[in-house]
Amino acid sequence: MAELDGVWNVKRLGGLLPPLIGVRKVIHGNRGETKLGPVPGASFDVVGRSLRYRAPFTGFVDELEPDGERYLGLATFRGRQFGRFAMERTGD
């Protein structure tokens, strides 16, 4: 989904997510990665507005909804929500 292409800063809004300081999502086409600083991160497939994580994180899915210039996300595991976050595009 081209509208998601780019580098996004991630901010925790609530739930069981840890503080997300330094966390970014890098998306290109139908693939992406959640990264913490320079460390390689968790890979995912983009399916519509869902980010479906690959092994070893199979079962984790981020569901995104547009909110102006940003996206609001629900972090889920096997269909159960455990956290909320926002994604804002970086200047990169």
Question: Could you say what each language-model-derived stretch is?
Answer:
Residues 1-37, 73-75:
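Tryptophan-anchored aromatic micro-motifs
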Residues 16, 29-70:
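Contiguous, well-ordered beta-strand patches that form the walls/edges
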Residues 54-92:
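Short, compact, well-ordered microdomains
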